[in-house]
């Protein structure tokens, strides 16, 4: 009888979510299938023994055929091409946007006017002034808001943070980040492109600097400390590519970025980001972190560490084969918990923020800091000089 009573007392709190522009790869896979659908499939977000938050999405977009196909594939019953009608429904409290960067401001403005809580992909804009304007718009309206900062919940970064918090590294000295892979140009039909063509057109909001420096801003700030200044060089190594329709087009923005960040605490971070690099490392993103008492190699899912006591003593001698196996001296940090999908974890945090007013520091204002860093990176490249990173207004 107690079990039946407990079930009757369990409140299921429905929360309607307008999911705009999720027919693309990232929106479909990470946000819809592996986040919202996964939350629904697990029975919602359980808060203690008396509350469950259950997301109820409605898919919105311009292409009714794509929306219908996605709805059928995922079992989502609600979809529409009429965004205004969706925004007018008071039963849907959250607006999520994964559309193109250049379209994001207009969608956010409409959703804020409708009183919705705002959650969106990064970058929130391509200019700092616009990103900050959107943040202030949400703040003035008093609506809860957040931006995707998924990499903070990746397994490898969480393992590193645990070791850092336990004091393993001593004083951290430097960080070397390598990100990227070879994106096929589309010129060979047996090597189809694996990134949309708009990524290589400035006029469509493309460019690896605006894309990846937004990520590095929050990764560096959260794991290592506030960024004081930066130096950045970009490049367009591949001048032309072939688009989804088989047409050759000119690349009008950067496909590679080489940036150095000086932090307020003295740590130096170097991050190379490229869609024109072939991978011979542990993962598509790796960071080497060196400290006085230990070092780490941080990947997306794994993390390896080496302590001061197990550091080998190499001697420079190019006339003989290297006697030290440098890979053998590293220890993998084991899984000590169950690691969920990074996007899903942040979705759960945001929905709890909306329903229960729990803290959620990853706001549009924080997202504007990423846009600011990217814009400063572009300026540094254009002017060929170091730039300080000022506080946002």
Tell me the role of every PLM-derived stretch.
Residues 93-94, 100-101, 105-152, 167:
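Beta-strand-loop-alpha-helix segment that lines the small-molecule cofactor/substrate pocket
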Residues 49, 78-90:
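Short acidic low-complexity segments
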Residues 120-121, 145-147, 176, 271, ...:
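Hydrophobic residues in well-ordered beta-strands that form the structural core
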Residues 242-245, 249-250, 258, 262-263, ...:
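C-terminal glycine/acidic-rich active-site capping loop/insertion
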Residues 4-74:
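N-terminal Rossmann-like dinucleotide-binding module
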Residues 151-250, 384:
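Predominantly a Rossmann-like dinucleotide-binding segment in NAD(P)-dependent oxidoreductases
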Residues 211, 218-230, 234-242, 247-295, ...:
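Glycine-rich, aromatic-lined ligand/substrate-binding cores of catalytic
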Residues 143, 170-174, 379-393:
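C-terminal capping/lid region of NAD(P)-dependent oxidoreductase domains
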């Amino acid at each position: 009888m107690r079990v039946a009573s407990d079930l009757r007392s369990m409140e299921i709190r429905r929360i309607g979510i307008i999911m705009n522009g999720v027919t693309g790869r990232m929106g479909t896979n990470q946000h819809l299938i592996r986040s919202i659908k996964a939350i629904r499939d697990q029975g919602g977000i359980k808060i203690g023994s008396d509350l469950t938050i259950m997301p109820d999405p409605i898919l919105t977009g311009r292409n009714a055929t794509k929306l219908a196909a996605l709805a059928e594939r995922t079992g989502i019953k609600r979809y529409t091409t009429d965004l205004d009608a969706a925004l007018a429904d008071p039963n849907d409290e959250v607006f999520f946007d994964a559309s193109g960067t250049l379209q994001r401001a207009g969608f956010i403005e409409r959703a804020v006017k409708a009183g919705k809580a705002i959650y969106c992909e990064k970058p929130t804009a391509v200019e700092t002034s616009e990103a900050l304007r959107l943040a202030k718009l949400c703040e003035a309206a008093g609506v809860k808001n957040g931006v995707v900062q998924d990499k903070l919940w990746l397994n490898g970064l969480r393992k590193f943070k645990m070791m850092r918090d336990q004091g393993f590294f001593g004083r951290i000295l430097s960080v070397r980040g390598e990100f990227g892979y070879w994106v096929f140009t589309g010129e060979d039909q047996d090597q189809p492109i694996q990134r949309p063509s708009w990524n290589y057109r400035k006029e469509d909001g493309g460019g690896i600097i605006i894309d990846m420096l937004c990520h590095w801003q929050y990764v560096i700030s959260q794991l290592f400390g506030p960024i004081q200044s930066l130096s950045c060089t970009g490049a367009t190594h591949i001048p032309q590519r072939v688009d989804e329709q088989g047409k050759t087009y000119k690349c009008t923005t950067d496909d590679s970025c080489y940036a150095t960040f000086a932090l307020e605490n003295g740590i130096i971070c170097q991050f190379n980001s490229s869609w024109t690099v072939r991978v011979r490392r542990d993962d598509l993103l790796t960071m080497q972190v060196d400290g006085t008492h230990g070092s780490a190699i941080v990947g997306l899912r794994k993390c390896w560490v080496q302590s001061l006591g197990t550091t080998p003593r190499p001697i420079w001698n190019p006339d003989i084969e290297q006697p030290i196996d440098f890979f053998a001296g590293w220890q993998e940090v084991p899984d000590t918990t169950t690691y969920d999908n990074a996007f899903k974890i942040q979705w759960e945090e945001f929905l709890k923020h909306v329903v229960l007013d729990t803290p959620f520091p990853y706001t549009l204002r924080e997202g504007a800091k990423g846009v600011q860093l990217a814009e400063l990176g572009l300026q540094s490249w254009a002017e060929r000089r170091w730039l300080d990173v000022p506080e946002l207004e």
